[in-house]
Amino acid sequence: MPKETKETKKYKVEDEFAKAEKTSFVHIPSIKLDTSTLANNFKSLNKNIIPSGKLDYDNDNNENNNNNNENKHIDKRPQLISKKDKRKQKKEAFLQKFNPSLKLQKKKQQDDDESNDGLGMGGVLSSIDLLKDSMKLQPKTKGPKLTNEKRKKMSLKEANQYKNVLSHPSFKANPFATLQEHLANSVALQNQKIKQEQDFKPNNNNNNRNKLKRK
């Protein structure tokens, strides 16, 4: 068997590399890179496109992290109200119902709405509200029980009144103004009755006291 020399070993290495370049699946091409063409192309690029200086990515990331941390610390749960504050709110709401200054402001606002309203609906609504308030203040008393005949008479009477109102010339000319005047008059009558009843009660109490003293 012949001995292997340095030359035979060299040929074997070359053959192995030659075999590695060609496989049964892929042929690996040999590419030569021309550095001069790359350098020329790089010089021809527009320098304005390439950003100058360092981009400060770290500061942006730090700002975003700080904002996220601040949002995490914000408590989005509904705040609980103590019993003392609840009682205070209820008391204020109760006092506002009986505050005369608030009623005057409400009436003034309604008057302004009436002046702005072409049809005069604001005045009608304000007089309706006043009538409701006076009806609430009036003490409730149980009236006599109505029979069927009395109910029929009342319904006929109301139907006739309704027809008379519709046929009235002032109602035909300006129905909203007529309703407003009627409601204002009814409110004045209700207030007058309430005042008379309140004045009548102290007089009765004084008379009863005088009678007891005489006895």
UniProtKB/Swiss-Prot annotation:
Keyword Nucleus listed? The answer is yes
User: What keyword terms does UniProt attach to this protein?
Assistant: Nucleus, Ribosome biogenesis
Where is this protein localized, as stated in its record?
Nucleus, Nucleolus
Q: Where is this region: Disordered?
A: 49-121, 133-157, 189-215
Gene Ontology biological process terms, A to Z: maturation of SSU-rRNA from tricistronic rRNA transcript (SSU-rRNA, 5.8S rRNA, LSU-rRNA)
Instruction: Offer one Pfam family short name for this entry.
Output: SLX9
Q: Which InterPro entries match?
A: Slx9-like (IPR028160)
Task: Tell me the function of this protein.
Answer: Involved in ribosome biogenesis.
What is this protein called in UniProt? Putative ribosome biogenesis protein slx9-like
Species in which this protein is naturally found: Dictyostelium discoideum (Social amoeba)
Q: What is the lineage of its organism?
A: Eukaryota, Amoebozoa, Evosea, Eumycetozoa, Dictyostelia
